[in-house]
Regions:
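N-terminal glycine-/serine-/threonine-rich beta1-alpha1-beta2 phosphate-ribose binding loop
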Residues: 1-120
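C-terminal catalytic/substrate-binding lobe primarily of soluble NAD(P)-dependent oxidoreductases
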Residues: 2-11, 201-446, 451
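Short, ordered loop/turn segments at secondary-structure junctions
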Residues: 51, 93, 109-110, 132-136, ...
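Short gly/pro/ser/thr-enriched loop/turn and capping motifs at secondary-structure boundaries
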Residues: 54-55, 135-140, 144, 161-165, ...
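Short acidic, glycine/serine/threonine-rich loops at helix termini
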Residues: 60-61, 140-143, 166-169, 184, ...
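Structural detector of well-ordered beta-strand residues that form the stable sheet scaffold
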Residues: 89, 129-130, 155, 180, ...
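Rossmann-fold NAD(P)-binding glycine/threonine-rich loop
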Residues: 108-124, 131-152, 157-159
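Rossmann-like NAD(P)H-binding beta-loop-alpha module
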Residues: 147-220
Length: 452
């Protein structure tokens, strides 16, 4: 990215590379480590934590780094990083607490675990870059409150769809246009996919079958569009957005899928389609100046009133270092929520579910996520897809039925549940989730400031 590349080169010349501490060493963490190691001057992957330490060791060696050392104490950790060793932390909080780390990157995909890591990083003055759309979509707005409280930044990443879309939105606004539709493009949508159906694909690319399932069943794209909605104030037309509407026409004609008056009335929408080919994300925008509309037509953008802008790819870990540099060097947040949540992700039954069943996590066998406007989510007390794991059903649920908090017994003592309750209370003065936690789990979970 222009400006970022020169700033990173300057850090390299000064011998002061950005020291990255990464939590999570899966497929994306592996790619990010390799990218930083070989293609990003002025930055180094100083430390990695993974629940299975051998996986953290692997991502270093995958990247050609052999000077790998384990660190069990803060003193061991800090010394190893100072010495320039490829450091594997036995505890993620060693990364968060170290004065030798400049920024924490969360690549876990976990809401509960991610929340603990993020808040610990904040306590020690560390900015956090998220490659964890799930935590951002579920409790991102309240985590931003804590980031501001501690004077740090919590940012989405470049390369992944939310960051890619917000970069495009900022660019389009810079041209003087008004974004109206921000769209994400998929190649497949089937809410009933599961790790069994996706196993072969996952093995082919060396990915986790549950994560691949979350791509196919619509959960991941719902998390992503929720982040974009919260960063722009845009809504969804209805729960589930366009639910896999297939479009194989030209990107120049995709505006025909949308009624401009309806979209204006909503203040803009986030959406997704299956297709068209050659497009990964798009933004439809209008221009208020008829003189400029004349020029846009001349420049082959069509007659309007909605003009298409798009990016044909998303390169995830190739571009993620740009976000790290933007945050550390410029204090530039990639996709911060404007304020409270605007769109959230509710849990929907993937099959008929029996009373007493325990739900598995997103991307598995029991549920899928759909984007829904916060007013509906709050009023109907839907269960968020990011927090389904470990919930026990109190009644039978039919396939395609939205799950609510009243339908489940929550796992006890989760930080993320307290943060959800605080998020509703802070932004909408709604206390029903506080009351629900008090009724079902006792006073310890009531109105507790999660990071006080």
């Amino acid at each position: 990215m222009i400006i970022v590349d020169n700033a990173l080169k300057a850090r390299e010349q000064q011998g002061k590379p950005i020291r990255v501490g990464m939590v999570g060493a899966g497929f994306m963490g592996q790619g990010l480590t390799n990218q930083i190691t070989h293609s990003v001057p002025g930055m180094r992957m100083a430390a990695v934590y993974n629940r299975r330490p051998e996986r953290a060791q692997h991502v270093y060696r995958y990247s050609g780094l052999e000077n790998v050392t384990m660190a069990a104490t803060q003193a061991q950790f800090d010394q190893a990083v100072r010495q320039g060793l490829s450091t594997v932390a036995e505890d993620p909080f060693l990364i968060c607490r170290s004065g030798e780390i400049d920024v924490v990157v969360d690549v876990t995909g976990s809401v509960e675990f991610g929340a603990h890591v993020i808040l610990e990083a904040f306590k020690h003055g560390k900015p956090v870059v998220l490659m964890n759309a799930e935590v951002d979509a579920t409790i991102g707005p309240i985590l931003q409150v804590y980031a501001r409280k501690h004077g740090v930044i919590l940012s989405a990443c470049d390369g992944d769809e939310p960051g890619l879309q917000m970069n495009l939105v900022r660019w389009v606004k810079g041209l003087g246009l008004i974004p109206r539709v921000i769209g994400n493009v998929k190649g497949l949508q089937d809410p009933y996919r599961n790790p069994t159906t996706q196993q072969a694909w996952a093995e082919r690319w060396g990915q986790n079958a549950a994560m691949v399932t979350s791509f196919a069943d619509g959960s991941k794209i719902s998390f992503e569009q929720s982040i974009v909605a919260n960063a722009t104030g845009f809504k969804v037309r209805s729960r589930g957005m366009s639910r896999g509407m297939k479009y194989d026409g030209s990107i120049m004609d995709i505006h025909k899928l949308y009624d401009l008056d309806e979209i204006r009335a909503l203040g803009g929408i986030v959406d997704y389609t299956v297709g068209p080919a050659g497009v990964k994300i798009f933004c439809l925008a209008e221009h208020p100046d008829p003189k400029q509309r004349h020029y846009l037509n001349l420049y082959k953008m069509g007659e309007g009133p909605l003009y298409p802008f798009w990016v044909p790819y998303h390169l995830v870990h190739f571009e993620a270092p740009n976000a790290i540099a933007r945050v550390v060097l410029f204090g530039d947040n990639v996709a911060p929520p404007l304020e409270g949540p605007v769109v959230e992700v509710c849990a929907v039954a993937k099959r008929d579910l029996a009373v007493g069943e325990t739900l598995d996590e997103y991307g598995m066998y029991t549920s899928y996520g759909e984007a829904v406007n916060t007013e509906e989510m709050n009023t109907r007390r839907y269960l968020p897809e990011g927090l389904v794991d470990g919930c026990k059903l109190k009644r039978a649920i039919a396939k395609n039925e939205v799950l609510t908090y009243d339908d489940v017994e929550l796992p006890s003592g989760r930080l993320a549940d307290r943060l959800r309750a605080e998020q509703y209370r802070h932004f909408s003065n709604a206390t029903w989730l506080d009351e629900h936690l008090q009724r079902t789990q006792g006073a310890a979970n009531v109105r507790s400031e999660a990071c006080a």
